[in-house]
Amino acid sequence: MPEETQTQDQPMEEEEVETFAFQAEIAQLMSLIINTFYSNKEIFLRELISNSSDALDKIRYESLTDPSKLDSGKELHINIIPNKQDRTLTIVDTGIGMTKADLINNLGTIAKSGTKAFMEALQAGADISMIGQFGVGFYTAYLVAEKVTVITKHNDDEQYAWESSAGGSFTVRTDTGEPMGRGTKVILHLKEDQTEYMEERRIKEIVKKHSQFIGYPITLFVEKERDKEVSDDEAEEKEDKEEEKEKEEKGIDDKPEIEDVGSDEEEEEKKDGDKKKKKKIKEKYIDQEELNKTKPIWTRNPDDITNEEYGEFYKSLTNDWEEHLAVKHFSVEGQLEFRALLFVPRRAPFDLFENRKKKNNIKLYVRRVFIMDNCEELFPEYLNFIRGVVDSEDLPLNISREILQQSKILKVIRKNLVRKCLELFHELAEDKENYKKFYEQFSKNIKLGIHEDSQNRKKLSELLRYYTSASGDEMVSLKDYCTRMKENQKHIYFITGETKDQVANSAFVERLRKHGLEVIYMIEPIDEYCVQQLKEFEGKTLVSVTKEGLELPEDEEEKKKQEEKKTKFENLCKIMKDILEKKVEKVVVSNRLVTSPCCIVTSTYGWTANMERIIKAQALRDNSTMGYMAAKKHLEINPDHSIIETLRQKAEADKNDKSVKDLVILLYETALLSSGFSLEDPQTHANRIYRMIKLGLGIDEDDPTVDDTSAAVTEEMPPLEGDDDTSRMEEVD
């Protein structure tokens, strides 16, 4: 800037220049900054703007008790002035300024307590963007500047200039340039390869990213050109003036001639008036643009903000083309102080559970200075769809990842954010239509929360919605289910599966539906993981109807009948277990079947058929767990079914009847399929079925028209039974 150059060229008699050595640690830090390559050099501007904002905060605070402090300048603002001719970038504020002692102490001779700690962190691979936390953010100026000049004026002292090219020392002198009134001007003499930071587009981009919500106006001064219509003579005059300016810069003194030309031009103008021809010329002017017009909406009172304002802010924050579904705006005060503005989007992103993608849904600010947008410590994974802003008053500026993980403040903020999100969901649940939209998009997140978040499991379980055997096309909450429970019903019954139709027609729900007991249909894969953690709701245990030991409400007479049936079919159960060997753990008489002859249930702590299917579908599954989790199958038979009764008679008549073995295996394999399991050897099962079809159609096994290949296959199969037993086979069928 011209005024600075003048002051630097003053003779030594008029001003005293004092030279100071940097304190050893600061010199070391500057050397580290200058000689190491950092990709995110842009943070220098954030640091300087933050420093300006702090200086403005201080003068504003002082003026509250003494308004005369602002007599030296009432406006509180920050200006950014790029100068391409001088290759400088200047940041000016009207803050508190610095005295001579402040300049010497703050910028060089007294190391901040964090200087050494920061250097150690930096050498250990920490990110340079955390520098502000250690109180040495000013030195980031040397990431882009070869020389830095600081001109400052404090109300209690004269105007001083500080300057250093980072060679181990700095100078301080009285500044006789243009009076500032009050404040600080930081002039960065940029390195040759860092001129991008004089570009309007780049400055705007950095300010929007890091300092958009600083509480004071940030104005960018840019020299621009515009077309101006003038007469020929005016155009010539302009050209002459530009030539004179060039001569001046080269050291040629031609001032008298400029005055003559100017006066002649004015006389000519008066004489000729509008007769001159018009001509368009390029005129340079300084354009001033405020870069942070979007005021931090979260600092305002929620009662004063309209839905439209929230909507506009949400769209500018997320670039979403749709309106948000719900919003929660709150502040926490007391020992800890922070504000938050949280939004629920209308739809879930397609990559919601993509682990490798960095989430940048929550922007973390510290005293309105942007810190980071991918702070995973703020929210648990199941709330990764929440968008918004968190602004803390207590966290240190530019906090590092390592410190975040140990920060007690952050843990308290996180706890409060989760609590407020759950409040928001419960408020949303009061509006059935909106909650339906929310649940369609984010039900998986709620269920993941139940699996992961033990502290909030109860509150999350109240948000669950399911189809049931009594709800029709409407999803109901567990609370609704409990209000409809029968008097003697102790448990909440549920079944997991692939589709609503599949579970509704399942053999497992037959007796429950017959007795008018409501069954919850869980048809999403994540439900399996959810119910592993959700053991009970409002004192009622959740019971899977596909597992062993199902207890149904029954009177004494029913219990007595069941015991009689167990005794009657005890022998058949033993025979079937001997035939199936290790395929099943046990064969028992069922209390859950009505129309199906048999079904396969799993042990209480083993996987359900649905869970087994989910695990098998996982590409990176651990096969070692498949053995002990999936093997515990129990075959339950229906004592009231004609197939089972006839099979009992057949087995008791002749224990060695070959057809009994074949029929038992066929029943078992069919039960596997109908219970949701997959067959280990589907081809063998298919061949058994084809043989049954042949018997049903009366096709003779020895018929020469039978295809040779199928005959070869059937030779490997155990025979169904002798020809003389065909009629009995058909009877069973």
From Swiss-Prot:
Q: Name one GO molecular function term.
A: ATP binding
Instruction: Provide the assembly information.
Output: Homodimer. Identified in NR3C1/GCR steroid receptor-chaperone complexes formed at least by NR3C1, HSP90AA1 and a variety of proteins containing TPR repeats such as FKBP4, FKBP5, PPID, PPP5C or STIP1. Forms a complex containing HSP90AA1, TSC1 and TSC2; TSC1 is required to recruit TCS2 to the complex. The closed form interacts (via the middle domain and TPR repeat-binding motif) with co-chaperone TSC1 (via C-terminus). Interacts with TOM34. Interacts with TERT; the interaction, together with PTGES3, is required for correct assembly and stabilization of the TERT holoenzyme complex.
Question: For this protein, what post-translational modification is recorded in UniProt?
Answer: ISGylated.
Which positions bear S-nitrosocysteine? 599
Which parts of this chain are annotated as the region Essential for interaction with SGTA and TTC1? 730-733
Q: Which Gene3D superfamilies match?
A: 3.30.230.80, 3.40.50.11260, Heat shock protein 90, C-terminal domain (1.20.120.790), Histidine kinase-like ATPase, C-terminal domain (3.30.565.10)
Which keywords label this protein? Answer: Acetylation, ATP-binding, Cell membrane, Chaperone, Cytoplasm, Hydrolase, Membrane, Mitochondrion, Nucleotide-binding, Nucleus, Phosphoprotein, S-nitrosylation, Stress response, Ubl conjugation
Which residues lie within the region annotated Interaction with FNIP2 and TSC1?
Answer: 285-621
Motif TPR repeat-binding, residue range(s) on this chain: 724-733
The chain residues annotated with the modification Phosphotyrosine are 314, 493
The UniProt function text for this chain reads: Molecular chaperone that promotes the maturation, structural maintenance and proper regulation of specific target proteins involved for instance in cell cycle control and signal transduction. Undergoes a functional cycle that is linked to its ATPase activity which is essential for its chaperone activity. This cycle probably induces conformational changes in the client proteins, thereby causing their activation. Interacts dynamically with various co-chaperones that modulate its substrate recognition, ATPase cycle and chaperone function.
EC number(s): the record gives: 3.6.4.10
Does the keyword Phosphoprotein belong to this entry? yes
InterPro entries per the UniProt record, alphabetical = HATPase_C_sf (IPR036890), Heat_shock_protein_90_CS (IPR019805), HSP90_C (IPR037196), Hsp90_fam (IPR001404), Hsp90_N (IPR020575), Ribosomal_Su5_D2-typ_SF (IPR020568)
Q: Name one Pfam family in it.
A: HSP90
The name on file for this protein is Heat shock protein HSP 90-alpha
What is the native source organism of this protein? Cricetulus griseus (Chinese hamster)
